[in-house]
From Swiss-Prot:
Keywords: Disulfide bond, Protease inhibitor, Secreted, Serine protease inhibitor, Toxin. Its main location: secreted. Serine protease inhibitor. This is Kunitz-type serine protease inhibitor G1. It comes from Micrurus pyrrhocryptus (Coral snake). It is found in: Secreted.
Amino acid sequence: KVPAYCKLPPDSGPCKGHFPAFYYDPVSSYCQKFI
């Protein structure tokens, strides 16, 4: 089962903070980290 946070799109938003987040990559079938 894929965690809910992995289903979110990779949106860094307007914040200038440097916080790691995750999104689901259907090509690799894994959660990918982005900042």
